[in-house]
Amino acid sequence: MTKIAVCGAAGRMGQRIIVAAREAGCTISGALERPGHEMVGQDAGLIAGCGALGVAISDDLNAVVEGCDVLIDFTTPKVSLKNLEVCALKKKSIVIGSTGFTPEERALAVELAREIPAVLAPNMSVGVNVCFKILKDVAKTLGDDFDVEIVELHHNKKKDAPSGTAVRMGEVVAEALGRDYNKVATYHREGICGERTKEEIGMQTVRGGDIVGEHTVYFIGMGERIEISHRAMTRDMFSRGSVRAAQWVVGKAPGLYDMQDVLGLK
């Protein structure tokens, strides 16, 4: 039975991960929150609404990591890298669902994961990861004859933009077309900005209300358009995916994996 610790246990995602882990038959071995959080000391199960677990929410990262097989982390890149470093020192696995990593932060994650098996994925949804595979195939088939635009929508509390999922979609398409995403991504158009180049991949961001997450990739040709969309109705698919990744990664060889590895889509 996999022993899972949850970082950000009192948050919306942390609570859903605790519920999903219990439903999957895993043991919640630890629950972590930042020092000074008002829920420190409270039973993690009661906070998550799944009944008392006898596991108090803690602010002691080292102790929580020591007692688990794998840590699930949906926080921020800065916090995730700190957690990854501690997991590497203690030879524990980690699943990271945080978004907004810079290229430098991702490179550091790759380096730290030389010591342990780690999953880093901007989206833990099975459906989204199937979309990644579809996008690769569609982009290769259509080639340079279709313009590519990506639109993503999220709730008004989301802190990073564009979403990590949208960026990964752009990277998948760019790789399939032999382009450098960082050079062709266009995040803003305003005023007289000139004609659209053939190589660019447009990225548009919408924030409002309580939208869990929606992503649409448009392949726009002359007289026809293909739209590949994914809409998240609840966060539960992310929590279930993270637990699936946690069960998968324990015992794997050291290295940085993603959900494509977890789902066998590579």
UniProtKB/Swiss-Prot annotation:
SUPFAM superfamilies: Glyceraldehyde-3-phosphate dehydrogenase-like, C-terminal domain, NAD(P)-binding Rossmann-fold domains. GO terms for cellular component: cytosol. It is found in: Cytoplasm. CDD domains: DHDPR_N (cd02274). HAMAP family: DapB. (S)-2,3,4,5-tetrahydrodipicolinate binds at residues 155, 164-165. Catalyzes the conversion of 4-hydroxy-tetrahydrodipicolinate (HTPA) to tetrahydrodipicolinate. InterPro entries: DapB_C, DapB_N, DapB_N_CS, DHDPR_bac, NAD(P)-bd_dom_sf. NCBIfam families: dapB (TIGR00036). Belongs to the DapB family. Keywords: Amino-acid biosynthesis, Cytoplasm, Diaminopimelate biosynthesis, Lysine biosynthesis, NAD, NADP, Oxidoreductase. GO terms for biological process: diaminopimelate biosynthetic process; lysine biosynthetic process via diaminopimelate. This is 4-hydroxy-tetrahydrodipicolinate reductase. The active site is at 154 (proton donor/acceptor), 158 (proton donor). It catalyses: (S)-2,3,4,5-tetrahydrodipicolinate + NAD(+) + H2O = (2S,4S)-4-hydroxy-2,3,4,5-tetrahydrodipicolinate + NADH + H(+); (S)-2,3,4,5-tetrahydrodipicolinate + NADP(+) + H2O = (2S,4S)-4-hydroxy-2,3,4,5-tetrahydrodipicolinate + NADPH + H(+). GO terms for molecular function: 4-hydroxy-tetrahydrodipicolinate reductase; NAD binding; NADP binding; oxidoreductase activity, acting on CH or CH2 groups, NAD or NADP as acceptor. NAD(+) binds at residues 8-13, 33, 97-99, 121-124. NADP(+) binds at residue 34. Its EC number is 1.17.1.8. Pathway: Amino-acid biosynthesis; L-lysine biosynthesis via DAP pathway; (S)-tetrahydrodipicolinate from L-aspartate: step 4/4. Pfam families: DapB_C, DapB_N.
